[in-house]
Amino acid sequence: MKSGRFIGVMSGTSLDGVDVVLATIDEHRVAQLASLSWPIPVSLKQAVLDICQGQQLTLSQFGQLDTQLGRLFADAVNALLKEQNLQARDIVAIGCHGQTVWHEPMGVAPHTLQIGDNNQIVARTGITVVGDFRRRDIALGGQGAPLVPAFHHALLAHPTERRMVLNIGGIANLSLLIPGQPVGGYDTGPGNMLMDAWIWRQAGKPYDKDAEWARAGKVILPLLQNMLSDPYFSQPAPKSTGREYFNYGWLERHLRHFPGVDPRDVQATLAELTTVTISEQVLLSGGCERLMVCGGGSRNPLLMARLAALLPGTEVTTTDAVGISGDDMEALAFAWLAWRTLAGLPGNLPSVTGASQETVLGAIFPANP
């Protein structure tokens, strides 16, 4: 069974940077050693946003974007290696999630698409890459997402305490770690995505630092109720979603009925949408004693305060409080999934994704010996 140093690379739906994590992994433990966040050039970020909202690209443009993202991921890995004074031979493999540009797990031909050419990463780092983690699960009838609950269960499950792990990235997803029950998990809906999109359009800021804008506004209840009527929120699990659904166009369609509203009030309403949809799912799932939050949203004081208010009797904390960096959780998970792939172990949980069976995930892109 392969063990040693692994690198995880994650570029999520928030597009706030490439997260790269170095860890030692074996069958007994996962120990994070180092991490960094690598910036995404504005031009690349905009290209990804455009394609996620349905803008048509030529095959040439699509191929170029795939190559550019692969090179970006390789640059991020090489920066971490240099910072840690490591060589390619010191790393067993890289687990690279890729950049999701479309996720459509339902319908006649279910599919998901993550780009960022793994061949570029191998060629530029000299390290074996494991990628394309989601499509095997979809081929077996699953949603292909979320995949991180298996990792949450391995690290954070408790024999007697009802726990849930909440990742608030661009999309929010919940892992249900309930003693005596199969692991559950699904996407609850928008996390930071709509808030980030709104403040970017209104104020040219990548995100609402310390929720300053949202805290200066007031929740527009009719707008909130209008958004909550979206059928995704009442859809039963297993379910997953992404930027191809909850994007700026989705927000604009709801705002048409509310002309002239204060932008800060919209920001406050979007924050409330995130916390209400999360808390409703926590309660529908039977509640928990401890909700551990990770992802960029864990640093948003308004989101954390509202979750605590909406979930009385639940200890709302961050995964940092139990020794796991909330910023690095997903990248660490894909390093762990790469280890499982190389070990020939399944990486999905049918109780989460709805797949017909457990399966080894991913494709292996071997480095030259």
UniProtKB/Swiss-Prot annotation:
Q: Does the keyword Kinase apply?
A: yes
This protein's pathway = Amino-sugar metabolism; 1,6-anhydro-N-acetylmuramate degradation; Cell wall biogenesis; peptidoglycan recycling
Task: Write down the EC number.
Answer: 2.7.1.170
Q: Under the GO molecular function aspect, what terms does this record hold?
A: ATP binding; kinase activity; phosphotransferase activity, alcohol group as acceptor
**Gene3D superfamilies in the record, alphabetically?**
3.30.420.40
The chemistry this enzyme catalyses reads: 1,6-anhydro-N-acetyl-beta-muramate + ATP + H2O = N-acetyl-D-muramate 6-phosphate + ADP + H(+)
Q: Which UniProt keywords apply?
A: ATP-binding, Carbohydrate metabolism, Kinase, Nucleotide-binding, Transferase
Q: Name the positions where ATP binds.
A: 12-19
The family annotation for this protein states: Belongs to the anhydro-N-acetylmuramic acid kinase family.
List the HAMAP family. AnhMurNAc_kinase (MF_01270)
Q: What does this protein do?
A: Catalyzes the specific phosphorylation of 1,6-anhydro-N-acetylmuramic acid (anhMurNAc) with the simultaneous cleavage of the 1,6-anhydro ring, generating MurNAc-6-P. Is required for the utilization of anhMurNAc either imported from the medium or derived from its own cell wall murein, and thus plays a role in cell wall recycling.
Protein name as annotated: Anhydro-N-acetylmuramic acid kinase
Gene that this sequence comes from: anmK
